[in-house]
Amino acid sequence: VTVADLRFPGTWRRYQELAFAAFEADRAAGRRRTHLVAPPGSGKTVIGLELVRRRGGPALVLVPNQAIQAQWVAQIGRCGGAGLVRTELDRDAPISVLTYQALCRLEDPGAALRELAQARWTAERAAATGESEQAVAAAAADWTGEAERRRSAQVSRIVAAIKREVARGEHPDLALADLLDRGARERVAALRAAGTATVVLDECHHLASLWGYVVRAVLAQLDAELVVGLTATPPAELTAAEGELYEALLGPVDFSVPTPAVVRDGFLAPYQELAWFCAPLASERAWLAEHDVRFAELVTALHDEVPAPDGIPAPLSFPAWVLRRMRERGAADGAAEVPWGTFQRRRPALARAGVRFLLSAGLAPPPGAPRGEAFREPPDLDDWLVLLEDYALGALAADPSPAAAARHEAIGAALRDLGFTLTRQGIRRGRSEVDRLLTSSAAKPLALVEVLACEDEARGETLRACVLCDAERAERRADGALTGVLDATAGTAARAVLALAEDLRTAPLRPLLVSGRALRCVPEDHEALAAALDIAPAVVPDPDADGLVELRPGAGPWTPRDWVPRATAALTAGHTRTLVGTRALLGEGWDAPCVNVLVDLTVATTGVSVRQMRGRSLRLDPQRPEKIASNWDVVCVAADLARGAADYRRFVRKHAHLLAPAEDGVIEAGPSHVHPLLGPFTPPVAAELAVVDRAMRARAADHAGARERWAIGTPYEAVERPTVTVRPVREDLAAGETARDAGVQAALPLSQRAPVLTAAGGALAVAAGTALAGPVGLAGLLAVPGAGLWAGLRLRRAAALAPPLPPLDGAAHAVVEAYAALGELPRDVADSLVVEPRSDGYLRCRLRRGTPEHAALLATALEQLLGVVESPRYLVSRPMRVPGRGPLGMLARVLRRRPPLDERWHAVPDDLARRADRAEAFHRAWSGVVGPSELRFVQRSDAGRALAVEAAGVAAGYEVTVRQVWS
């Protein structure tokens, strides 16, 4: 049997055949790299093996861990090649499956690097001083004290620089391959002697760091004819150097199949993304509140003048500094004052934060500064950070007085409590004790109990859960700041097992802790689980410090290679219905098709880690063809306290690039696919989070609905398009007013809405024109019998057509009509505009047809039109009803020669404001929707800039988010 004799016993799926076509295209073009992306469970291993078969000859497969190594060996055996594979180089075989670690082990290069760094330091100092290198070296040998400490620090920095050069292959005298340890060098030599022609890099997303540099050096020595990269999650968050390395190793992605496509085709289990929200326990909240008070005390203290010794000028007080910055509007170094509009355009965050602070403190903002709703909000944490950074760097850092230094240190200390660092360059974000408390809160294991109790109620004996944590047990005691608040097991897998075992609802699940160190459970489950694992311990051991007991046989080897398969088999059989493990062991490469519930308790937020963990639940279960997978996050929120939304923001980052069906069946990225109330910035209030938790219970039990939302077997385009989701900001509505009253119309196809919108615009023009006839004309009109009633009805009609918020469907219609008039949107695409209602008052606006580029035009323009643009070129107006002003009030305004309706200005979207003809095209479409309107260019006159400032100061009225939607 040879490599060419390998045969896949199944039938190739459509996307697998497309992957092979991409490979053949690469080979026909003479390319030596093939980069394929497919989700976990989609058969990447068999794809890679088929490419090895097609290429023929000796092959090397590199994998990140032993679990994936075992999968390759098993798959080769299923394809008839059991005798063709080796996992050690102790015998001849044409396919070698090794871990990256086996080839990437480096010797300790410390001595060699230090010697090179010493030589470079000597040469650089000799060049700077004009002395010979020998003289510099001799003098340095006698240095002691501070001089020697400085020299040692400089040499250490040079060592770090040389490490980077060696890793990148840029050092003239030292190659990375020279640093491989003896075993790695021998393996590389053996593989080269065997004539290795094909190298498969499985889970190649790991190669954007040190492994990548080492693998690049190894590949250079092997001189393989073909390199294949396989991954489910190409890394997206890369530095420039990492991106360059990854691109050099693998080249661009040749073929990618998105996870939703494989689910829609029926080859992965349909899944739903769910979340459970909890609040910190009372003791934890008290600790958080104390830190919140400290920050509030800092803010209060900043209102006091800084005392200063005689002869040293005191820095300005904080309010005086902010007032000066807002009034003078120069740089902190005293640069010339600039107009407010220019200042707001250059420093929008500082301008907004400054005005908010002044208004909240009862201080008058400078002339020209906006005073609208968006600026009347009290400063939030982000505003304070902007102001404190400007104050610390501009006022305090330049002042030599001890009092200024003390205040600078006080600001730094208060910020450190919240996880921020005040540096000479500004404020940097980091992980704080507040973050750690929220991620490790004792409320999370209790929430885990609720999640699995809910799932047990819905699934019964078919429940197979996997709970992923960052660590098995605490490696150290709780930090001093959290002593007495968090115990030693906080946030660990051990704590999760104990919580499940202590609750009567979840104890029957028999939670089993699986780590790279051991198998553990509570003493009460030891006998049953030992029997299920087919081990016969001599005695039940005593509980360890965590209160758990270890499961191990009485004799013989016992390693993860032994216990992970047994634990997986016990889960599959239902002897335990919950495995609790670490992300490192079970979060990637672990194959357990029975898993139908995944609970993510980790802090991981990168797209690579999140998608890998989700992949554990997506494989089809041969025993349960109707499997529905539920993936849960547990989030701890105290949003009313400083930094209390840190865990929520982590949750948002997890879901930013994760595609899943929302409650209406649209497959989208972002937290709103969990629930529409979950936005990308701040968490909902506590009452709304309770609503979300109730909705999660219902969705967890609605397996039929979950399957229906996926529409399995229906055709798809496999295209991602941006769409806009909006909801009126509740504070913008008058008492008793609904979203519909405020301007959100029912969702209708454009073919039905367009005539309504056009007629509405015309009616508004007539009504408004009549109402503006003036007091003399109106008085004469009122003398005619019935005319007063007619005028009142017309005014009522005008008010109804001029809501406080711009009509969403009208705004979207204006955008697509403008682009259609400019020839940039085909008519059939423009006519495919729909506004669809979601739950909780949200609406989704999208194009059913067209390219992603067409969708991006609508999404970007609508987001700007309904939001606030800091520096617009053109503004358009619309008449607006003032909430609470009825027909009589409007008539009274007309009699006083004042317009019955107010005027609200909106920024013309940037792309449509690039030239006058484009702005005019939008204005025509806009006027057809909202009625009488005016277009103004605002960047060349003081009046125009003032109008732009006024428009920016008005609250947007809509909460607008843009999401990627797959279809």
Q: What is the role of each PLM region?
A:
Residues T2-H35:
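Conserved pre-motif I regulatory segment
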Residues P39-S42, P94, E124-L174, R182-E186, ...:
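Conserved C-terminal RecA-like helicase domain
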Residues P40, V46-R78, T99-R105, W211, ...:
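Conserved Walker A/P-loop ATP-binding site and its immediately adjacent core
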Residues A67-D92, P109-Q118, E247:
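Conserved helix-turn-beta segment of the N-terminal RecA-like "Helicase ATP-binding" lobe
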Residues W72, E107-P109, E203-V218, A240, ...:
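Conserved ATPase-coupling elements of RecA-like P-loop NTPase cores
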Residues L106, G484-L486, A501-T506, L513-V666, ...:
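Conserved RecA-like P-loop NTPase helicase motor core
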Residues A208-L268:
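Post-DEXD/H (motif II) to motif III coupling segment of the RecA-like Helicase ATP-binding lobe
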Residues A296-V355, A361, Y648-P909:
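Long, largely alpha-helical accessory region at the distal end of helicase-like NTP-driven motors
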